[in-house]
């Protein structure tokens, strides 16, 4: 559950969104990617964190949409944001508390749906071999610290990154250049 909880909190902490967000105002407006990227770089059309967790491994990343002329800068900003979350002192207690509260709220609201509860039971049985009660999940979330999130982010960045691009990719920085930026974590 350690990886799952850290991954979920980290995804919420990073957050993101688009320059236009359907579903009403206020969604993700306090997340790091919204505050530090979308409000500052108007050429970025969307910039969001994503994650998937499996038994003993997982996937965490950032996807972005931007015009071709801004893609090199956008990739640089994405790298900077990933490095920032792995750097002690760059994430505040307020940001972590907000991410924890948002994640807990989202999980509790989702568990009001019987379909989602059934999917969650199946996912936990397949992934962990048993189902943990919601109180266990809530306690794990509450116990996460800034040190836990920083250590988890460092662990994520210590693996070889994967990079995918589509569209007009002529101005996308080469993989080797991007990968080298994370060298200090390996």
Positions of predicted regions on the chain:
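His/Glu-rich zincin catalytic helix
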Residues: 1-36, 75, 161-186
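Generic recognition of stable, solvent-exposed alpha-helical segments in well-folded globular domains
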Residues: 4-9, 28, 32, 73, ...
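A glycine- and charged-residue-rich anion-binding loop/surface
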Residues: 8, 48, 137
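Generic hydrophobic alpha-helical scaffold/packing signal
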Residues: 10-14, 34, 38, 63, ...
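M16/insulysin-pitrilysin zinc metalloprotease superfamily fold
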Residues: 16-28, 41-44, 48-115, 184-186
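Glycine-rich, charged/polar anion/phosphate-binding loops
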Residues: 33, 45-50, 148-150
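C-terminal regions of mature proteins
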Residues: 100-186
